[in-house]
Amino acid sequence: MNPLNPSSDGIKENLLTLLAQKAYRFGDFSLASGKKSSHYVNCKPVSLSGPGLLSISSLFLKQINESDSGVAGLTLGADPLVSGVVILAAQSGIDLNGLIVRKEAKGHGTGAWLEGPLPPKGSVITVLEDVVTTGGSSLKAVEQLRNQGYLVKQVLAIVDREEGGLDAISKADLELNSLFFLKEIVERANSLQ
């Protein structure tokens, strides 16, 4: 089997196990949203590993519309996701631009919010996200992209914690598509103990 073309179901199952083993923790945590939780998911140990990023990128690429000109996300969590999808797209003969959205405007030079090859205004960009809780990070990226004249219709996330992110993203006239819900990762982690 070609490692770039295994079945989506097999990729997803393997990725779920990786997330349960390397990204999920149980305890007392403060989330970026300010909420407290006993479940914590840090996708970076998976998205910054070769097998993890290849799996995520493959699954994301299958959900990107042919009319999209690029993918983007808020630094730092989306940096490997954007890079992985763009590389895999290029290997598949698909021309996608990768954009990184800064958390604040660059303090020197052009003062840019966006880094990367900027497609023409009006281009459709899909936002990539590691974990969606309230949707705040995704919406910050969407806001900056829309302010620059891009159309954003969809957010792709590795994990949806199901804590209001879907509602917030839907209210911004966006679709949220997640590879997993937090409960799936918790169930897999519990089954591996």
From Swiss-Prot:
Q: Does the keyword NAD apply?
A: no
Similarity remark: Belongs to the purine/pyrimidine phosphoribosyltransferase family. PyrE subfamily.
Concerning CDD domains, the annotation shows: PRTases_typeI
The record's listing under InterPro entries reads: OPRT, Or_phspho_trans_dom, PRibTrfase_dom, PRTase-like
Report which reactions are catalysed by this protein.
orotidine 5'-phosphate + diphosphate = orotate + 5-phospho-alpha-D-ribose 1-diphosphate
Q: One GO biological process from the UniProt record? A: pyrimidine nucleobase biosynthetic process
Q: Which cofactor does it need?
A: Mg(2+)
Which GO-annotated molecular functions does the record name? magnesium ion binding; orotate phosphoribosyltransferase activity
| Main function | Catalyzes the transfer of a ribosyl phosphate group from 5-phosphoribose 1-diphosphate to orotate, leading to the formation of orotidine monophosphate (OMP).
The answer, when asked if Cell membrane is one of the entry's keywords, is no
Swiss-Prot/TrEMBL keywords: Glycosyltransferase, Magnesium, Pyrimidine biosynthesis, Transferase
Query: Recorded E.C. number(s)?
Result: 2.4.2.10
Binding-site residues, 5-phospho-alpha-D-ribose 1-diphosphate: 102-103, 106, 108, 129-137
Enzyme class, top EC level, equals transferase
Binding positions for orotate?
Answer: 133, 161
Q: How does it assemble?
A: Homodimer.
Alphabetical list of HAMAP family matching this protein = PyrE (MF_01208)
Pathway it works in: Pyrimidine metabolism; UMP biosynthesis via de novo pathway; UMP from orotate: step 1/2
Name-wise, this protein is Orotate phosphoribosyltransferase
**Classification lineage:** Bacteria, Bacillati, Cyanobacteriota, Cyanophyceae, Synechococcales
